[in-house]
């Protein structure tokens, strides 16, 4: 094992044996890779995860196995604490890297010592590993270096497998609080509050969409909503040395809270959770009344107040061109 890896790749893993091999292969098949280590913390998997890890025995690979499941947040905290690299990247076992991921993110961080975090674009893949399209539109035209804090408060546009940061930037925010439903946005927002970011305008990772995605589960059960507003309440808590919000803290709060309530309303509407959708639409309208100028938003909000059945019938008729 390299005594001083430049990069640590940490993988919190639980019952993803069917995808883990693809993830590890993408790591060990990097081109022009710097000295690196891979830290896998297996959170008590009951599938073939141990057998998959044995197939990838390598001096660069360190494996920690829990005898019982301790939960995703505890596993992430442990994995980050074990990382020894100057830079750290975190990837879930169902995602994978493009061959130039390591060389590119390490180049950017080495060439820009003031930058705390680098992220690039990601492509969507299905459960078979077939690319299905881009995950989102690129947030910038070309490479970008600067503050992403306010933009990240409004929208989580950093795809976890397509990102990496300096060790100290990560560890300033470890441990992740127990009960937080996700940690990607937590790290992005809090690191962006202190450090400039660098956007690399290139596809450097693949994000897999499948039926067991963690994010879909937390969106449906409400834990995503609770975690979002826990973090926002913390960020906007008045502090003497706080971030200088412009034009004012209150204006930024209305914009940010409104954006998240609207996003949650649209998700709940898609899941058929009408009461939650209506509640979040109303909160979004209170924060940002202009969101009703979007005809689609207005129609969907109306459907939660009046009749979802009428909305579905109207949508079907319009879809047939009537």
Describe each model-derived feature in a short phrase.
Residues 139-228:
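Conserved nucleotide-sugar donor-binding catalytic segment
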Residues 72-75, 103-172:
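Flexible acidic/His/Gly-enriched loops in nucleotide-sugar-dependent glycosyltransferase catalytic domains
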Residues 88:
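Short aromatic/hydrophobic "clamp" motif used to bind/position activated sugar donors
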Residues 26, 42-51, 68, 92:
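A conserved acidic beta->alpha catalytic loop
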Residues 66-83, 147:
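Glycine-rich, basic loop-to-helix element that forms the pyrophosphate-binding segment
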Residues 21, 47-55, 96, 100:
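Acidic helix N-cap motif at the loop->helix transition within catalytic regions
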Residues 157, 180-181, 186, 193, ...:
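C-terminal subregions of glycosyltransferases and related glycan-biosynthesis enzymes
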Residues 25-35:
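Short, acidic, metal-binding catalytic loop of nucleotide-sugar glycosyltransferases
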